[in-house]
Regions:
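Core segments of small alpha/beta cavity-forming domains
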Residues: 3-6, 10-16, 21-25, 68-160, ...
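Beta-strand elements of well-folded, non-transmembrane domains
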Residues: 17, 75-77, 183-187, 207-209
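Short beta-strand edge/turn micro-motifs at domain boundaries
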Residues: 32-37, 42-47, 62-68, 76-97, ...
């Protein structure tokens, strides 16, 4: 995944370590090719939010905007093992990552609004961009905006989401972003038993500035979305 970073060059990590496994925390910043260490340092946390320890990395070195780097968050465990989390980072204040993530989460939430009228739904305007195109979705296991509205709202299966959504930005630049959502749902089958489904959705979205002060929808709209 990739983590957009604003010009303040601060990256924040939230760590769930209720068992106290980690003894020390540190980070490394590398060139994307992995052949040049740009900086590293130790990390401490004095902040906790919702049970997560918060670590802020303030990148000291000058890094080029719109250039990808590899950031490694490391923790050394009590058993002598080192755990590493890798992410790409890129600096740009104009990617509108927060707005795009908000849009994707709203689109996803709308697929669980089983009572909404199709034409009044949040999804409907984005389906119209694909109106008249052949439906190339394979089944309920693979849907996109050429699918019917009924399919996009789960065709009467009425699942319940039982995990938090985990969003990941896979790609991002000033033109568009690819965002992945992962979560688990459950639904009752015809035998009255519970089935469980691991869901992965992909969205290709782009940001548009609002045309008027009252036009709030296009401010977080997308030209294309796929799930």
């Amino acid at each position: 995944c990739i983590t957009p970073v604003t010009d303040d060059k601060k990256v924040t990590f939230a760590v769930d370590d209720k068992n106290g496994y980690a003894k020390t925390y540190s980070y490394e910043l590398w060139s994307i090719s992995g052949d040049s260490l740009i900086e590293n340092g130790d990390l401490t946390s004095d902040t906790e939010e919702n049970g997560y320890r918060i670590f802020d990395i303030d990148i000291r070195m000058d890094i080029k905007p719109d250039t990808e780097y590899m950031l490694i968050f490391k923790l050394d465990g009590a058993d002598g093992q080192t755990v590493r989390y890798y992410t790409r980072i890129v600096v740009n204040d104009n990617y509108h990552a927060s707005e795009l993530l908000d849009f994707v989460e709203q689109f996803n939430a709308s697929t669980f609004d089983y009572e909404a009228n199709e034409e009044g739904s949040f999804i409907y305007p984005y389906m119209q961009a694909y109106k008249g195109q052949d439906d190339d979705s394979l089944s309920m296991g693979h849907l996109n905006l050429t699918s019917s509205y009924k399919e996009l709202v789960w065709s009467g299966v009425n699942p319940v989401r039982i995990t938090s959504i985990i969003p990941q930005i896979k790609e991002i630049d000033v033109n568009y972003a690819v965002i992945e959502l992962d979560y688990v749902t459950t639904a009752e089958n015809t035998d009255g038993e519970s089935d469980y489904y691991s869901i992965r959705e992909y969205y290709r979205v782009s940001y548009k500035e609002p045309e008027t002060e009252d036009d709030t929808e296009t401010a977080t709209g997308a030209e294309d979305a796929e799930a």
